[in-house]
Structure formats: C-alpha cells, structure tokens
C-alpha cells in the first residue's frame, strides 16, 4: 500500500502542479488517491485562506450578524473577496455607528431644547431640566442672572426683617420730637415771663 503513494506525491510536490493538471485528476480515480485528495486540496487552500483572516472574519460576523462563511463554503470564496468583505464590514459598522450617533445626538438636542424653552416661558426657574438649551452660552448667563436676582431678593428680605427686633423708628422719632418741643416751649415761656412778667401775667397760648 505504501509503494504507490510515494511516487504519486513526489512529482506533484517537485513540479508544483495545479488542480487542473491530469496528475491530480488521476489521484482521485485510485482508491489510494482518494485519501490524499483532501491533503492536496488543503495544500492549495493554505496560501489562499490564512487562519488569522478566517478568525477575523468569524469574529466580525459574530458581532454584526449571520456569518457569510457559514452560508458559503470556504473553497468557493476568492481570497480577494474575503479580504474585501472583512475590510468593508468594520468600515460599515463604524459608519453606521457614526451616523447613528450623530442622528441620536441631533434628535436629543432638538427634543432637549423644547423642555428648557417651556420652563423658561412658564417661569419654572428653580426646577432646571438636566438637558442643555439651544445655545451653550445663554443658559449659564440666564442662570447667573436668576441667581443674582434671588440673592438680591433674599438680602432685601433680610434687611427688612432686621428692623423687626428693633424699636419702631416712628415711636422713637416722635419721642425725640416731643422732648425737643417741650424744651422749646420752656425756653419761650421763660423768655415771655421775663419780658412781660413785670407788666402782668398773661396766659401763654
């Protein structure tokens, strides 16, 4: 059994025959050649499909969807076709993710502008939405103005409330005015008594 196998394989390796040569066709006709025909096919498939390319193709196909290598057997695919498929799929995935991300960001920005606008119109200043407004510079300025207004209102309320514990200014003012008026009446009355007291006492009005 071992003698007919060696002379049949020796010229195939030495001459570098292809699949279409009659020497390899004769291998398939013999009973012993049927065993070596898969070896000859694997010999010619090694340079066409490297294991690294097949692994990359399998990983990309698992991540993106149904694998093309399972639907179509390996020997029927050309080496250039497999490389182009492997290169196109990651590129398409990147483009899809890029365009999809941009689309989602645009929709988010469009939808996020409406709640911010409605809150500003209704006057809901304290309950700020987590979404940003249409422009990136206006909302911070608006929030700063609102915060400044709230601080001024709080300071004015504290200033007005600080007088509640103190005595009322009206009562204090009237007391001082009464004291001053009493002193002035005393001065006038003493002067009137001095000048007109000699002639007669007249009721001071």
Swiss-Prot record:
Domain of life: Eukaryota
PTM section of the record: Phosphorylated at one or more of Ser-113, Ser-137, Ser-156 and Ser-171 in response to survival stimuli, which blocks its pro-apoptotic activity. Phosphorylation on Ser-137 or Ser-113 promotes heterodimerization with 14-3-3 proteins. This interaction then facilitates the phosphorylation at Ser-156, a site within the BH3 motif, leading to the release of Bcl-X(L) and the promotion of cell survival. Ser-137 is the major site of AKT/PKB phosphorylation, Ser-156 the major site of protein kinase A (CAPK) phosphorylation. Methylation at Arg-132 and Arg-134 by PRMT1 inhibits Akt-mediated phosphorylation at Ser-137.
Subcellular location: Mitochondrion outer membrane; Cytoplasm
Location of the region described as Disordered in the Swiss-Prot/TrEMBL record: 1-139, 161-180
Phosphoserine, modified sites: 67, 113, 129, 135, 137, 156, 171
Sorted UniProt keywords: Apoptosis, Cytoplasm, Membrane, Methylation, Mitochondrion, Mitochondrion outer membrane, Phosphoprotein
MF-aspect GO terms: 14-3-3 protein binding; cysteine-type endopeptidase activator activity; cysteine-type endopeptidase activator activity involved in apoptotic process; lipid binding; phospholipid binding; protein kinase B binding; protein kinase binding; protein phosphatase 2B binding
Sequence ranges of Polar residues compositional bias: 85-98
Tissue specificity: Expressed in all tissues tested, including brain, liver, spleen and heart. In the brain, restricted to epithelial cells of the choroid plexus. Isoform alpha is the more abundant form.
Domain notes: Intact BH3 motif is required by BIK, BID, BAK, BAD and BAX for their pro-apoptotic activity and for their interaction with anti-apoptotic members of the Bcl-2 family.
Family: Belongs to the Bcl-2 family.
Subunit structure: Forms heterodimers with the anti-apoptotic proteins, Bcl-X(L), Bcl-2 and Bcl-W. Also binds protein S100A10. The Ser-113/Ser-137 phosphorylated form binds 14-3-3 proteins. Interacts with AKT1 and PIM3. Interacts with HIF3A (via C-terminus domain); the interaction reduces the binding between BAD and BAX. Interacts (via BH3 domain) with NOL3 (via CARD domain); preventing the association of BAD with BCL2. Interacts with GIMAP3/IAN4 and GIMAP5/IAN5.
Official protein name in the record: Bcl2-associated agonist of cell death
Annotated source species: Rattus norvegicus (Rat)
Gene: Bad
């Amino acid at each position: 059994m071992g003698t007919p196998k060696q002379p049949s394989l020796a010229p195939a390796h030495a001459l570098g025959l292809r699949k279409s040569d009659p020497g390899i066709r004769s291998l398939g006709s013999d009973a012993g050649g049927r065993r070596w025909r898969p070896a000859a096919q694997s010999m010619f498939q090694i340079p066409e499909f490297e294991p690294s390319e097949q692994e990359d193709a399998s990983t990309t196909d698992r991540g993106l969807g149904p694998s093309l290598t399972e639907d179509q057997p390996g020997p029927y695919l050309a080496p250039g076709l497999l490389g182009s498929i492997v290169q196109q799929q990651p590129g398409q995935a990147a483009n899809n993710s890029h365009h999809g991300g941009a689309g989602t960001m645009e929709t988010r920005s469009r939808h996020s502008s409406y709640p911010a606008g409605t809150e500003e119109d209704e006057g809901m200043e304290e309950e700020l939405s987590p979404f940003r407004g249409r422009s990136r510079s206006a909302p911070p300025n608006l929030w700063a103005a609102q915060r400044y207004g709230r601080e001024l209102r709080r300071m004015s309320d504290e200033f007005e409330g600080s007088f509640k514990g103190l005595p009322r200014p009206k009562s204090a003012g009237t007391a001082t005015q009464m004291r001053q008026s009493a002193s002035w009446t005393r001065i006038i009355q003493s002067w009137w008594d001095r000048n007109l007291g000699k002639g007669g006492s007249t009721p001071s009005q």
